[in-house]
Amino acid sequence: SFTGDKKLLYKANYCLRTALRILLPIATFRATNPDELYAQLKRLDWSAWMRSGDSFAFDTVVYSEAFTHSKYVGYRAKDALVDYFVERGENRPSVRLDNPDRLFHIHIAHDEVTLALDSSGESLHKRGWRVAQTEAPMSEVLAAGILMLADWDGSTDFVDPMCGSGTLLIEAALIARGIAPGSFRRSFAFQRWLDYDAGLFDLVKEEAASLLRPFEHHIYGSDNSIEAVKVARYNVRTAGLDDIITVAHRAMQDCPAPEAPVLLVTNPPYGERLRPRSIEDLYRMIGERLKHNYAGSKAWIIAYKPEHFDSIGLRQNVRIKMLNGSLEC
């Protein structure tokens, strides 16, 4: 969590590369049962955050023995909000699960309740540049996080020899050029808030644009699937980055050795889609290519079992545990 003003909230949505949502807490209280929850919520001044004609939805996360069903928490919250407006003689607000005017989050830990407004809308991993995808594409925020862990700063060429739909390539380009990840999005939820300041958001975007920088190197992607290559090229063009990203149709073992040290980051096909013997052979091939073609370069390889690294056969400097969706890697 962090504390800041309205400008920082806008900037967090527009510029953060590894956040999924930016929530603004608006009320905290205690409740030991659903009736107390209803009473506490109904007591709030909902007109400070929405009009009766606005649509809304609740997202709930519950860690409590007193509240065993998160959906029921959402129902009681909905009743409290609707009753607040109806009893004031206003229109009955409508629930809309898809892209509501206001999305509220309720988090309950034991008897501590936090009500927050979602300022983002769609998850921030949905940058806006992905117009096509391959099977099980990597999340944009995961890709950005891995690149930040790898200390990618655009000071060398970048290589992903198993690029799939191009997520790592594009996120690497955004970082290298200092492009804000939110610059591709059509909108954010805070733009529909009652206190939205369009001029302030324009200032945030102008300040982000002032941080753009030249990238003097190149980003190379390849994949042995022609369909993946087509998807990656399409996404690269949509992002307007085809001047610094080249995507080729070739397998990793056919990739030429770079002329100078590079940063290589790749997410090989994982276990659910390959036979055990195929996985072992794949990672052994990766190790051989790294040894012969990428001496002096830095490589970050995503793997899903410790033995995958054993198959690579090279000494590792660091291993970092993370989640790719529901898969530990």
Protein language model regions, located:
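Hydrophobic beta-strand segments of well-ordered beta-sheets in folded domains
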Residues: 54-57, 219, 298-299
